[in-house]
Amino acid sequence: MIDFWCCVYASILDKNLFLKRIRFYSLLRVIVRLGGNIVLPLYFQLTAKNNSYRLSAFSKEQGRIIVTVTSFPKRIGRLWLTLESILRQKIKPDMIIVWLSKEQFPTEESIPFKLRQLRSRGIIIRLEEYDFASHKKYYYVLRDYREDHFITIDDDIIYPSDFIFSLVNGYKQNPNCVVSRYAFEMKYDLNGNLLPYMTWSMVRKEMEQTDVAFLGTGGGALFPAHSLYPDVSNIELALSLCKYADDVWLNAMLRLNGKKVVVVDNLFSIFPILYLKDFSLSSLNCHQNMNDVQIKAVRKYYEENIGQDPFAKI
């Protein structure tokens, strides 16, 4: 059921220029998105008692696969849809952790009931003191589970059933790399200068070990244990340089640590959750050129402090 909607949504491509100009494809995407956002929640509720849609008790103490996600009040009400899609994977992670801030969710009762119900099926919900925005998704898992591998997801996406399998399989074949399902190819001019973010092209096919892929954490990325530069846990520095772009920070950290990125299959088969009043960091970063501003800040800091540009052409 999930894969059907993901495939239908992914199949809508802007092939005809005229139809693109009259926004036919945009309208079609809206219709499909509305349909899926009606059908899938009903499907999830009707099948929630299936014993295969839960996590088993884990026995390993390190080397686990942990799916990590965060959310905020405007989206928390539908986060359960994202988590249902993760519970229905072909291969399941060892742990799924939701990191929330007490600044936004001061009590257990402030967490939606549907989300709290998922604890009985293995979901872990952690209330932490401070709100580090989207940086919560990696900061706390690195603090508490440093010897484990983690997969980042977003709270506004329903993931296809092969999502975790493709990332884990990519990691097994490339154990020294970070693995992603969604990335952009960074562009440089003839002199090796990094071009603006809006000129980068989306990666539409698999890429073997590469230095030019800028991964997106929301589309799904697997970070092996110890794959990131030690500064990754310096949350004050991260927030001062790129508060609204955990993607920028994590890409810088993997590059400073000498890691390459592998982009695996099926990059577009995700299904967006519909929110009536949505706020997207990706929209803010793209439309206001904030990605360029934050990338520039990160480059400047590391050039001045360690003499290395994390986004230099290699």
Label every model-predicted segment.
Residues 63-69, 86, 94-100, 247:
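Hydrophobic targeting segments
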Residues 141, 160-236:
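Conserved catalytic core of nucleotide-sugar-dependent glycosyltransferases
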Residues 69-81, 91:
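Active-site beta-to-alpha loop of glycosyltransferases that engages the nucleotide-sugar donor
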Residues 94-95, 149, 260:
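Residues at the starts of beta-strands that form the adenosine-phosphate
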Residues 2-46, 237-314:
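C-terminal catalytic/acceptor-binding lobe
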Residues 148-158:
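Short beta-strand-to-loop acidic/aromatic patch adjacent to the donor-nucleotide binding site
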